[in-house]
Amino acid sequence: YDLWRQSGNTGWGWDDVLPYFIKSENQERGESKFHGVNGPLSVSDQRIHLPLLDEFQNAAEEFGIPKTKDFNTGDNHGCGYFQVTEKDGFRCSTAVGYLNPIKNRKNLKILTNSHVKKINFENKTAKEVEYWEGNELKKVQANREIIISLGSIGSPQILQVSGIGNSEKLKNLGIDMVQNLNGVGENLHDHLMLR
């Protein structure tokens, strides 16, 4: 997060986003400097512990990789069991935690069987979203902002087809550039996980 802030994204450093993480959590371990207990996302320890994974942690420690019980303290280097967003054995996704409680609001429309095609810009400001609803291409205007939340693959893909990304790559694909932004769609790192 601090690298985001150092890149000019004011408000996106670790200290800036931590209060929002705390606000989002309902942490089963209880409230702490890094965790909240009143949020919509239930966070819990994994219920399974395997001897092989315990030994893996011991081996990692012998190579100088510290054991950690909490990867959400701002220093996520180490080896250990990660926590999960689940409650009573069921996944507590953003849809379950945030969307389900408000899905009947009059000012919210949930589209299913729809697929975003691209975002249209006006003077580098996102103005509308083009999307497919079934076989029909539709557009919706933004009154204030457009939030892209399509995961580590979908978000950069939509940015790129909308003209945000490496200018050479966009040009080779025949996409008109809105913003030359190297790094979009590159350098994906997944979380290393053993089970």
Residues covered by each model-derived region:
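Positions in alpha-helical segments
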Residues: D2-L3, Q157
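Conserved redox-cofactor binding core of oxidoreductases
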Residues: L3-A126, Y131-W132, H191, R195
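Glycine-rich loop(s) and the adjacent beta-strand/alpha-helix scaffold that form part
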Residues: I119-E122, A126-R195
